[in-house]
A protein has these predicted regions:
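Extended hydrophobic leader/signal-anchor segments used for secretion and membrane insertion
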Residues: 1-137
Length: 137
């Protein structure tokens, strides 16, 4: 869709709840770098159906097909895409007005912790959605 000659990076506001609790719709922003071959754990913007896009984390790669899932989505909710469908790869996020690079220790800690909490995510997300979202606007 885009290539390096067309842009260096692009920033947009996150919409939707699939990357909750760490990226909040309407508040946080993502800074995308041009497409490249993604690694497991990268957050990518990809077209997974015709004209349907998602900003999710790459969780698997098999036989030329990538699988991605939103951090706030159930474990069974995934999307598949091929490399040519990648629009961009996150290089940073702006959370609560502060830039967080994906190479920063803070982001790496978040990513590894969230991966380790996989068996407990459903409970943690339920608590987040039912309690924290109602308390904090």
């Amino acid at each position: 869709m885009f290539n390096e000659e067309e842009y260096k990076s692009v920033t947009f506001v996150v919409r939707g709840t699939s990357m909750n609790p760490f990226l909040v719709s309407g508040r946080d922003k993502v800074i995308l770098a041009p497409p490249r071959t993604p690694k497991i754990g990268d957050v990518v913007l990809a077209e997974f159906k015709e004209r349907v896009y998602a900003l999710h984390r790459v969780i698997d790669f098999k036989n030329g097909t990538y699988t991605m899932r939103g951090d706030g989505n159930p474990l069974s909710m995934t999307e598949q895409f091929t490399e040519e469908k990648i629009v961009g790869i996150a290089e940073a996020f702006i959370r609560k007005g502060k830039r967080v690079d994906i190479t920063s220790p803070k982001w790496r800690l978040y990513s590894s912790t969230w991966k380790a909490l996989r068996p407990f995510r459903r409970i943690l997300l339920a608590i987040y959605r039912r309690i924290i979202v109602k308390i904090l606007p």
